[in-house]
Amino acid sequence: MKKISLTLFAIVLAFATSYGQHFDIRAYGGFNVLQLTSDEGTSLIDGVIHDRKVSGRPGAQFGAALTFGSRFYVQPGFQYTIITSEVINENTVTKDVLKDEATINTISVPLKVGFRLINPEVENLFNARIFGGFDGSHVRSVDHSNKSNKTDDIEADDFTNLIVSADFGMGLDIFIFYVDLGYQLGLTPVYTGGDQAKANAFYSNIGLRLSF
């Protein structure tokens, strides 16, 4: 994943420099909220079936991107994301409840295309944008707040190697700052087993940009 992202950045930077494209470098941080398309299931704990429910909690992301083009632009990037979810397992016999907050750490290579409502060659201090694209994520690790050997905790190996999402939203560029609001729609299953749940997420970013 790291080699792919570095190669992609090198190719895009060489293209932008060679052909005189308007481009900028961006760094950002922000928040996200995850929601699975199928947030209910079952788990086996101590030989007893438990009803499992998963709900999203606020998470965070940090990244960098290179934007090149004029009114129409392309934006490859690299991102580190922290996703938090609460897992509730309810014993189907005793109705006892086990709660666990899982923190999922991922790296991803988002690729977006967009349209600026104002020509940046005329006005580069303020602009409004709409964008769409794809994001490929890989789960690096999973941490649990209430880990127990008695529970079948979800680990990094339980996730598919590449989780693909569609990405679309809007943004504002204001001087050297910018803000993005977006939504990711899961396209591939999150888990390696038979569960076909996909991950959707709302996110917002605020960052700095350097234009060239």
Spell out what each predicted region is:
Residues M1-Y28, L210-F212:
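Bacterial Sec-dependent N-terminal signal peptides
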Residues Y19-G63:
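Short glycine/proline- and aromatic-enriched beta-strand/turn motifs that initiate or cap beta-hairpins
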Residues G77-V87, A156-F212:
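Predominantly the C-terminal beta-signal and adjacent terminal strand-loop region
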Residues Q21-F23, G56-F62, T103-V109, F126, ...:
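Residues that define the transmembrane beta-barrel architecture of outer-membrane proteins
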Residues Q35-V54, I82-N105, H138-T160, P189-A199:
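Flexible, solvent-exposed loop segments that connect beta-strands
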Residues A27-F31, A60-S70, F78-Y80, V109-F115, ...:
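Residues on the lipid-exposed face of transmembrane beta-strands in outer-membrane beta-barrel proteins
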Residues Y19-F23, R71, I118-N127:
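Short loop/turn motifs that connect adjacent beta-strands in outer-membrane beta-barrel proteins
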Residues D100-K112, R116-N119, N127-V142:
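Structural signature of Gram-negative outer-membrane beta-barrels, strongest in the C-terminal barrel
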